Design a protein with these regions (language model features):
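One-carbon transfer enzymes
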Residues: 1-229
């Protein structure tokens, strides 16, 4: 399968590496523009962009997705079968999602529809959830509302923190994405793929809003367990 990979942070890298080392072909990568991350205001590329450059994969760093005709033209030239999206950082519009032959697919780090949105790992920890997981869903214009192809549940251990859980879910995302791509490669027609509507899963719909600055401060009156997390 010819794939355009969309991702930005370190979290995306494991999936990118696994797909790039598989029988499938990454024909292009889309990531966030370089950002100022040091005192000298030096522009630093994303981890995904660094990987693209070091592996000689065409990379695009658009400032915007909507109404970006130049980007649409370049993406269509790649003649891709799939878009694979994991922690890209922006919402893709319908015109973009419909470019690849067999759709756009996202690896989301929660058991949807619980924790739709930008910070599912953090919200699961803060809410005291006992389990979480990764779902591979077919993307649509809604916020993480697409039908699910496959998912896997994992336990959140008592001693789990953001770093350890992020690593686990990053590895799980890579594993499930390859499995999903192989399924789609065999079917070659999304109408034949067995997808599950999120609303049939009997789970509460919750939204994982971005973590605010105030939430980063420790409350010394809190429990030792919560402070550790």
């Amino acid at each position: 399968m010819k794939i355009v990979f969309w991702g930005t942070p370190e979290y995306s890298l494991r999936s990118l590496e696994v797909i790039n080392n598989s029988k499938h072909e990454i024909v292009g990568i889309v990531t966030q523009p370089d950002k100022k991350r040091s005192r000298g205001n030096k522009l630093i590329p994303s981890p995904v962009k660094k990987y693209a450059i070091s592996n000689n994969i065409p990379v695009f760093c658009p400032d915007k997705i909507k109404k970006n005709e130049n980007l649409l033209v370049e993406l269509k030239k790649l003649n891709s079968d799939l878009f694979i999206v994991i922690a890209y950082g922006k919402i893709l519009c319908g015109e973009t999602l419909n470019i690849p032959k067999y759709g756009s697919w996202n690896a989301h780090a929660s058991l949807l529809p619980r924790w739709r949105g930008a910070a599912p790992i953090q919200r699961a920890i803060l809410a005291g959830d006992k389990s979480t997981g990764v779902g591979i869903m077919k993307m649509e214009e809604g916020l993480d509302t697409g039908d699910i192809l496959i998912e896997e549940k994992i336990k959140i251990e008592n001693e789990e923190n953001l770093e350890t859980l992020t690593i686990k879910l990053s590895d799980l995302s890579a594993k499930l994405l390859i499995k999903a791509i192989d399924i789609l490669n065999i079917k070659k027609n999304n109408d034949e793929v067995n997808l599950q509507n999120q609303l049939t899963l009997n789970r509460e719909i919750k939204y994982a809003n971005m973590i605010t600055k105030s939430e980063y401060f420790l409350n010394l009156d809190d429990t030792a367990e919560n402070i550790y997390k």
